[in-house]
A protein has these predicted regions:
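Hydrophobic helical h-region of N-terminal Sec-dependent signal peptides
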Residues: 13-19
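C-terminal motif of bacterial Sec signal peptides marking the signal peptidase cleavage site
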Residues: 22-25
């Protein structure tokens, strides 16, 4: 997987997903926690609750802004976050480079920030996606899908248009709320049979010790997908930085931690 949402399950990437884990979205949602719509979002732009019947969120391009400066998921172009950890087997090393580019992608009429997310292991490429994010006027960060770069003969090749929202039944969802509150539960992305990720806000994640530095206050979320029963994934976020740590709560042994933040 990659740091954004879980890699969308197309035939071209299924083999890669068997080993790659990084900061992907298809993690885990909490067990039977209370839900509400995206905090601060109007009824017209709130995604459906992760519980109950699915209803696609109406998207109004006029309700989106050009920047992504949500405190818990700031995406400043030129910033690269680097993570180290292990893959699903708990042994194989991996490095994830989460690079916020200056590129833009139009999806469903919304101008999205493009993030290049690359996973390597022992110096060899494993997976690369280009993920699309946009922030609404209320401060919620939305996920609009991704492109996957084909891995062939040990090198990244052509792009595979593997999951833009608004096509083939795929719908966007939230990556981070403007005002996360304990018990909130929402869809990250909804594409039946390919990506059906949900997030639940667990509350404070407490103190974390990382190679990059230690943080006293963190936000803890948990993700899951019906496409991966039994797999639960937790993420720790820090204001002003974004995701700093991810670890499997059940189903696998994946783990990844922030080691550096650079700006250029």
């Amino acid at each position: 997987m990659t740091l954004s949402t879980s890699s969308i399950q197309t035939p071209a990437v299924l083999a890669v997903m068997a080993t790659a884990v990084a900061f992907g979205g298809c993690g885990s949602s909490g067990d039977s926690m209370s839900t509400r719509a995206a905090s601060g979002a109007s009824a017209a732009t709130s995604p459906a609750s992760a519980e109950g019947p699915w209803s696609p969120p109406p998207i109004d391009p006029a309700n989106f802004v050009s920047r992504v400066d949500n405190p818990y998921l700031p995406l400043a172009p030129g910033t690269t976050l680097r993570y180290r950890g292990v893959m699903k087997d708990g042994v194989t090393p991996q490095v994830d480079s989460f690079a916020i580019t200056r590129q833009r992608k139009i999806v469903m009429g919304v101008t999205c920030t493009v993030v290049r997310d690359t996973v390597t292991s022992r110096g060899r490429p494993v997976e690369r996606t280009y993920d699309w994010f946009a922030q609404d006027r209320q401060g919620n960060v939305w996920y609009f899908g991704e492109e996957t770069q084909e891995l062939k003969h040990g090198r990244f090749g052509k792009m595979i248009d593997s999951g833009p929202a608004g096509r083939n039944g795929a719908q966007p969802g939230l990556m981070m709320e403007a005002d996360p509150m304990q018990g909130d539960s929402y869809w990250q992305f909804h594409w039946p049979g390919h990506a059906m990720d949900t997030t639940t806000v667990l509350g404070s994640g407490g103190r974390v010790e990382l190679p990059y530095r230690s943080f006293k206050d963190t936000l803890l979320t948990q993700e899951q997908s019906p496409l991966e029963p039994g797999v639960k994934d937790q993420k720790w976020s820090v204001r002003g930085i974004g995701y700093v740590q991810e670890g499997a709560a059940s189903g696998t042994h994946e783990q990844i931690k922030l080691v550096s933040v650079t700006h250029h």
